[in-house]
């Protein structure tokens, strides 16, 4: 779809959506996004220019259907997929991608660390994906030196980053905010550093006693991103891995650096969103969102969860969706899903489905709470269908139509029950939805009550 759109931009030094927005140019991507969001195109351009919104759209991802991430638009959901050395392969990852898109993922991150040819897996995922694809290039950088962190060089990082950009990756997690002086701050934590990428950088700095190479070479990464319109997803290497560690000195020190890096990227018209925690008690979620907006000049916030309790392995799609809904309500722009397998293993297709639906619920609830235009329209339509016992319409409007129909049909599978005025919960005689109060009856009741009021006054 975008082949002709981007053809005229190739060869320019900067092809980012932010660059064009700041030049006053309305790109085709901005116009497309405006239609999807039902927002004025000029608002989209202004928000991208200001940095409060990004349109992750690598010029080499031409089959992309452009979308946006920002506080002015609907709350978005990311799904993670990825092969590991112990599980999964190319075909399985493409299948997970298709499933994620089916169930409403707005973006997908390929977090592959093994399981085959990483370049081939990434290429296949990008080719098959209508949604933006994100990656964490440090994983492949480590794989390229066979896991020997001490052998990694800044050139290794830059080489892999450019390779991902050339392939069409739309945004990349870059762990540039963790500095060598931050490392002593994790001493008081229960769970230390829980970011995979952050852990790699931390071990590199501890071995070499040198500053984070992604920080010292940040301007070179900016130059790569300008050429392909790759968006930064600034990684939170020091995100809390348990509620005990939430909002601590280490997390907030890195956040300050992420704000500085955000503004450095903006100086070159490169798009940025900022990643956030993690594990956060409910009473600290608002603080975390507001603090990010303050430190990062309102760049879009992209959070993993957050999980609001640590005691539910196997159900962390629920513990985190609670926090995600709150974070979205307070202004987070995108939620990274968590599956039931979080902390336990690599998610399979059913885990992807369950995690995504939990997060679509959270994002939608946030949109309603923020009074975004049209956010409740689907709810109202489903409520009408429910009141009218239009079962097929209810299934159709559900976030997971297959699951809704499956549960209904477990006890009432015959087609005749698709028009029945009850389900198996209440049966045919006790369903409260059968209580239909028509307008004439209400008019008669109002007359009766008015007469009673007159009689009381007369007394």
From Swiss-Prot:
It catalyses: 5-amino-1-(5-phospho-beta-D-ribosyl)imidazole + S-adenosyl-L-methionine = 4-amino-2-methyl-5-(phosphooxymethyl)pyrimidine + CO + 5'-deoxyadenosine + formate + L-methionine + 3 H(+). The gene is thiC. One of its GO terms (cellular component) is cytosol. The keyword Transmembrane helix does not apply. It holds the Pfam family ThiC_Rad_SAM. Belongs to the ThiC family. Binds 1 [4Fe-4S] cluster per subunit. The cluster is coordinated with 3 cysteines and an exchangeable S-adenosyl-L-methionine. The keyword Thylakoid does not apply. Substrate binds at residues 80, 109, 139, 175, 195-197, 236-239, 275, 302. InterPro entries: ThiC, ThiC/Bza_core_dom, ThiC/BzaA/B. Zn(2+) binds at residues 279, 343. Pathway: Cofactor biosynthesis; thiamine diphosphate biosynthesis. The lineage of its organism: Bacteria, Bacillati, Cyanobacteriota, Cyanophyceae, Oscillatoriophycideae. Keywords: 4Fe-4S, Iron, Iron-sulfur, Lyase, Metal-binding, S-adenosyl-L-methionine, Thiamine biosynthesis, Zinc. One of its GO terms (biological process) is thiamine biosynthetic process. Its cofactor is [4Fe-4S] cluster. This is Phosphomethylpyrimidine synthase. Catalyzes the synthesis of the hydroxymethylpyrimidine phosphate (HMP-P) moiety of thiamine from aminoimidazole ribotide (AIR) in a radical S-adenosyl-L-methionine (SAM)-dependent reaction. PANTHER family: PHOSPHOMETHYLPYRIMIDINE SYNTHASE, CHLOROPLASTIC, THIAMINE BIOSYNTHESIS PROTEIN THIC. Its EC number is 4.1.99.17. [4Fe-4S] cluster binds at residues 423, 426, 431. It comes from Crocosphaera subtropica (strain ATCC 51142 / BH68). One of its GO terms (molecular function) is zinc ion binding.
């Amino acid at each position: 779809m975008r082949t002709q759109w981007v053809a005229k931009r190739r060869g320019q030094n900067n092809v980012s959506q932010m660059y064009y927005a700041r030049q006053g140019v309305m790109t085709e991507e901005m116009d497309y996004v405006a239609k999807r969001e039902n927002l004025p195109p000029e608002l989209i351009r202004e928000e991208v220019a200001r940095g409060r919104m990004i349109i992750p759209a690598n010029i080499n991802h031409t089959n992309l259907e452009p979308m946006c991430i920002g506080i002015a638009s609907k709350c978005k959901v990311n799904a993670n997929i990825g092969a590991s050395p112990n599980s999964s392969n190319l075909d399985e990852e493409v299948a997970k991608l298709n499933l994620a898109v089916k169930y409403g993922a707005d973006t997908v991150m390929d977090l592959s660390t093994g399981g085959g040819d990483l370049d081939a897996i990434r290429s296949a995922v990008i080719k098959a994906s209508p949604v933006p694809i994100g990656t964490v290039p440090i994983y492949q950088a480590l794989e390229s030196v066979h896991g020997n962190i001490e052998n990694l060089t800044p050139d290794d990082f830059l080489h892999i980053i450019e390779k991902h950009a050339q392939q069409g990756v739309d945004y990349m997690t870059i762990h540039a905010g963790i500095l060598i002086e931050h490392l002593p701050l994790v001493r008081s934590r229960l769970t230390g550093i829980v970011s995979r990428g952050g852990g790699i950088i931390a071990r590199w700095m501890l071995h070499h006693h040198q500053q984070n190479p992604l920080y010292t070479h940040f301007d070179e990464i900016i130059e790569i991103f300008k050429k392909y319109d790759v968006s930064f997803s600034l990684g939170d290497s020091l995100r809390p891995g348990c509620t005990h560690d939430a909002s601590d000195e280490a997390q907030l020190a890195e956040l300050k650096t992420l704000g500085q890096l955000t503004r450095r990227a903006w100086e070159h018209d490169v798009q940025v969103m900022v990643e956030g925690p993690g594990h956060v008690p409910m009473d600290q979620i608002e603080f975390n969102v507001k603090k990010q907006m303050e430190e990062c000049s309102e760049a879009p916030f992209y959070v993993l969860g957050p999980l609001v309790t640590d005691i539910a392995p196997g159900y962390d799609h629920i513990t985190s969706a609670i926090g995600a809904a709150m974070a979205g309500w307070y202004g987070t722009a995108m939620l990274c899903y968590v599956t039931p397998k979080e902390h336990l293993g690599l998610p399979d297709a059913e885990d992807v489905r369950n995690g995504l639906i939990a997060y679509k619920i959270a994002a939608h609830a946030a949109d309603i709470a923020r009074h975004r235009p049209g956010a409740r329209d689907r709810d109202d339509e489903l409520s009408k269908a429910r009141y009218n016992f239009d079962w097929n319409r209810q299934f159709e409007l559900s976030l997971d139509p297959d699951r809704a129909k499956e549960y209904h049909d477990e006890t009432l599978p015959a087609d005749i029950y698709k028009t029945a005025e009850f389900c198996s919960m209440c049966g045919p005689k006790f369903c409260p939805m059968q209580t239909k109060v028509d307008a004439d009856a209400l008019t008669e009741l109002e007359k009766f009550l008015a007469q009673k009021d007159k009689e009381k006054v007369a007394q």
